[in-house]
Amino acid sequence: MPRTTPRTLTCGLLLTAALTSSGIAQTTPSRAVLPTGMGEAIDRDVARLRAATERLKVSDAAVAAGYTPETNCVQHQPHGAMGIHFNNMALRDATLDVETPEVLVYEKRPDGTLHLNGVEFLVPFTAWTKEEAPSIMGQKLKRADALGFWYLHVWNWTVNPSGLFADWNPDVKC
């Protein structure tokens, strides 16, 4: 049987910490979100976004931070689903900040718990006065005329086979 020394214990703890913080050791999905393959600037922004939303992975913490569940699970087959949107109405303005998303997007797991899959940045048309679309993380927000706002999804806590900024995730189920 191998001998446990302070050095092997330290190495094991460091490896566990590295895997956990990178998302590799999470039980959901086995593929890592980072690196994105979209360049260092996007990777830095995703890392900042993950650090800022780490505490909001538990939906009770999101509610305590001012987010309110606003939708049932949103899906659009055969493209997949988005999940359950938790909105923070106080953040709906013309300001976009990687560390302060307007919407958190959760998926209900078979055991009934909610898993934070990503976020949505949102700017109401009434708040945006410029001609060009607002942008964040090097991406222009999409226009949702029927809903009256600009938006961008970021799948920062789960891999989306359709892409980091895709609207729908085929792996998300309602």
Regions found by a protein language model. Give the residues of each.
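Bacterial N-terminal signal peptides that target proteins for export
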Residues: 2-10
